[in-house]
């Protein structure tokens, strides 16, 4: 399945959460790569129901009495407008400030640099 969306700026929290050691290890286990400490946010025209694609669920954890939620990941391939691509994953935390129209994508490298992306660029997601 192919989905198209636009690159948008995030809330700046992805780098903190992806950088937490328990998340980093879990994402490596589930995706096969150690994620870059940050996410690429992609805004869709319609709500996206991740559960339709059998995502992999992961549990939350606790650090110094603070709880961090689990979530789901789905392996995808992301393409820029020139057709360059990379294997990466949609990550959907159980607790998020994003709408169901915004996807957070993790990858082993910084996607904006690797795929030469800027805000409002169209990307293709292949599931």
From Swiss-Prot:
PANTHER family: RIBOFLAVIN KINASE. Pathway: Cofactor biosynthesis; FMN biosynthesis; FMN from riboflavin (CTP route): step 1/1. InterPro entries: Archaeal_Riboflavin_Kinase (IPR053397), RibK_CTP-dep (IPR039063), Riboflavin_kinase_archaeal (IPR023470), Riboflavin_kinase_CTP-dep (IPR023602), Riboflavin_kinase_dom_sf (IPR023465). Mg(2+) binds at residues 39, 41. This is Riboflavin kinase. It holds the Pfam family CTP-dep_RFKase. Belongs to the archaeal riboflavin kinase family. SUPFAM superfamilies: Riboflavin kinase-like. GO terms for molecular function: magnesium ion binding; nucleotide binding; riboflavin kinase activity. Its cofactor is Mg(2+). It comes from the Archaea. GO terms for biological process: FMN biosynthetic process; riboflavin biosynthetic process. It catalyses: riboflavin + CTP = CDP + FMN + H(+). Binds 1 Mg(2+) ion per subunit. The gene is ribK.
